[in-house]
């Protein structure tokens, strides 16, 4: 699963369009930078929080439907 060009592609290679979302992570610089990148591409219309951002740039997101999505922010 990965995130690219304002879409999320899941493990079955299904593409999901991503809408607007504000994500704020008041933590270390790395997480803040990742959050800024997510905000810049308008990531995820119904995401309510980022559960984790690890050193490899992998994101765990919690959606309003209580589904956790793990993806990677790619260029």
Please give the residue ranges for each predicted region.
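Mixed-charge, Lys/Arg-rich low-complexity intrinsically disordered regions
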Residues: 1-18
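Basic/aromatic-rich interaction segments and small domains that mediate binding to polyanionic partners
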Residues: 21-64
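Surface-exposed charge patches in extracellular/virion surface proteins
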Residues: 17, 30-31, 68, 72
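Intrinsically disordered, low-complexity, charged/polar segments
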Residues: 2-6, 53-75
């Amino acid at each position: 699963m990965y995130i690219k060009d304002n879409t999320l592609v899941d493990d079955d290679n299904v593409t999901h369009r991503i809408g607007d979302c504000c994500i704020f992570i008041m933590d270390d610089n790395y997480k803040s930078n990742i959050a800024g990148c997510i905000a810049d591409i308008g990531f995820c219309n119904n995401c309510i929080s980022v559960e984790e951002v690890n050193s490899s740039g992998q994101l765990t997101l919690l959606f309003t439907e209580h589904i956790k999505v793990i993806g990677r922010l790619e260029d």
